[in-house]
């Protein structure tokens, strides 16, 4: 594989947004948000592989399954990384009218209609365990990615079954499992509100909310090992500059009238909110 020269990550993120969402060029705040989210996904690639250049060289021409693709933030970064001869199978069971300010249908159609990245992505709207069980070829892939999707899932038991399904579908293939999730660790005091907001929503999940459970890296690691995966490299990204912390604080405030454990966590959250809310640290892991 020939080494690839990688542009500055900020310039690359801006270029990817220009390719997949050119209308944002006249909207400064949505453009800032989209670029920061893409920068973060590129940083995830760098964390998994040691550098963005190493990620590009490893993924070029490969087939990648992304589980929990949502509106495609990680999908775009993966489509760039696999190049013109690679492929991304992006799986998400959520209804296509889910999501705001852009639904999954709108976001996925927008990416599909972009060139050349859109042609590298196949969207699969079904439960990922069912998808892996029904399509034998789907599991024999090079990499399986779960980026900020575990907290959306219905239970830790389901995550354990998902890890088993991916391991079983991979068979003798040397598939690698790449995980990135909020690590329930705070290195910036301004991120404490994000942690409490996630804990509150996990204690009393919102019907249409993002957070459905609380999961620390140790528990995720144990679920994966019990499913037959072997530990690999782990890295942390400290308090990434994205807006998720503020979004989760806003979502948690809709639980203001609730009781129980969630009420106490909301009080803790409000007590530490002081100015802009930063994000928790992100835990990344590569399993074999």
Please describe what each predicted stretch is.
Residues 71-84:
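Conserved SAM-binding loop of SAM-dependent methyltransferases across substrates and taxa
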Residues 244-288:
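C-terminal lobe and adjacent flexible extensions of AdoMet/dcAdoMet transferase-like proteins
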